């Protein structure tokens, strides 16, 4: 994909961000369940229960099943991360040194992102010291541009994220990556793409011949490939939560209801009429010991009792 002008990038953003919004919503729900913030915590109490003095308990028990399953999966797969063997001992050692100590953690991060979002993304680059770097990227930020062929080819990547400027204004930043360069754009979060999108000079480059540092909206990476690698959670790119969310919600509802019932049992109100005893302590003692209490009765019309 060649360099895009401002109008083309506006069209690209509008065409793809709308469809990406559904993925963001689902990912945020999965991440919320991963953090043990299940739906049960946000359900409003029923009006009829709120007005019932005998139904005061409102415990919300959120179960961390999704987080436990995802962490177990990531640990099982990447406690010992994949090894590279190119049949050369020195080269294998060099690869291990380049990948560094963060390799296992990064693998787990990508796995967790894929489990929550359906796909995890790895970004790689060359830093200012000319060293190879890589990191997991929040899947909600990445909008892939695929070809329409049967063997889908990654034509470009649109990375979208919020950024706070030095003057305290919030911007939406759009990075468009192809196989040779990255173009940067931004707009105020409060503005629209059509009205507010502009080139963003976020990259700093040093010109050797003139020894001048200049700002640019374009960064040449020259990898010859788009420096983002997708890792799909499964063949249909669904999250791990999709299969278990109904079970988790039912468990939370039943368990929370059970705890509420146990607590509400203690809220029973006794109305005593013509009780023969002299104190409430005696009444509760008889009720506990004999499961009955004695009351006076003054005839058929008398409604003495509890």
Locations of regions flagged by a protein language model:
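Extended hydrophobic/Leu-rich segments
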Residues: 1, 9-13, 21-24, 29, ...
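Extended, helix-rich architectural segments
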Residues: 1-142, 149-152
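N-terminal start-of-domain structural block
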Residues: 1-37, 197-242, 251
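Exposed, low-complexity/repetitive linear segments and helix-based recognition motifs
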Residues: 2, 28, 36, 45, ...
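Short charge-dense sequence patches
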Residues: 7-10, 14, 39-54, 88, ...
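Extended, regular secondary-structure scaffolds
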Residues: 111, 116-117, 121-236
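Extended, charged amphipathic alpha-helical segments
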Residues: 206-306
């Amino acid at each position: 994909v060649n360099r895009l002008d401002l109008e083309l990038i506006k069209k690209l953003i509008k065409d793809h961000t709308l469809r990406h919004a559904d993925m963001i919503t689902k990912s945020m729900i999965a991440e919320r369940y991963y953090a043990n913030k299940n739906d049960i915590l946000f359900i409003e109490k029923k009006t009829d229960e709120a007005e019932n003095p005998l139904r005061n308990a409102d415990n919300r028990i959120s179960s961390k099943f999704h987080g436990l399953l995802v962490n177990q999966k990531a640990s099982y797969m990447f406690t010992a991360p994949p090894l590279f063997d190119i049949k050369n001992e020195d080269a294998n050692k060099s690869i291990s040194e380049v990948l560094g100590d963060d390799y296992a953690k990064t693998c787990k991060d990508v796995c967790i992102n894929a489990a929550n979002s359906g796909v995890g993304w790895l970004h790689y680059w060359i830093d200012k010291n000319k060293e190879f770097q890589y990191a997991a990227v929040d899947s909600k930020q990445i909008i892939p541009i695929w070809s329409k062929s049967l063997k889908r080819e990654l034509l470009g990547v649109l990375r979208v994220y919020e950024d706070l400027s030095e003057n305290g204004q919030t911007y939406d930043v759009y990075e468009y990556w192809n196989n040779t360069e990255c173009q940067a754009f931004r707009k105020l979060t409060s503005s629209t793409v059509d009205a507010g999108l502009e080139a963003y000079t976020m990259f700093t480059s040093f010109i050797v011949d003139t020894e001048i540092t200049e700002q640019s909206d374009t960064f040449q990476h020259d990898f010859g490939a788009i420096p983002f690698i997708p890792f799909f959670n499964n063949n249909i790119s669904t999250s791990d939560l999709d299969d278990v969310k109904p079970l988790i919600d039912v468990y939370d509802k039943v368990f929370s209801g059970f705890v509420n019932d146990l607590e509400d049992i203690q809220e029973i109100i006794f109305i005593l009429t013509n009780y023969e005893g002299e104190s409430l302590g005696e009444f509760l003692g008889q009720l506990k010991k004999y499961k009955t209490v004695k009351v006076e009765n003054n005839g058929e019309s008398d409604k003495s009792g509890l």
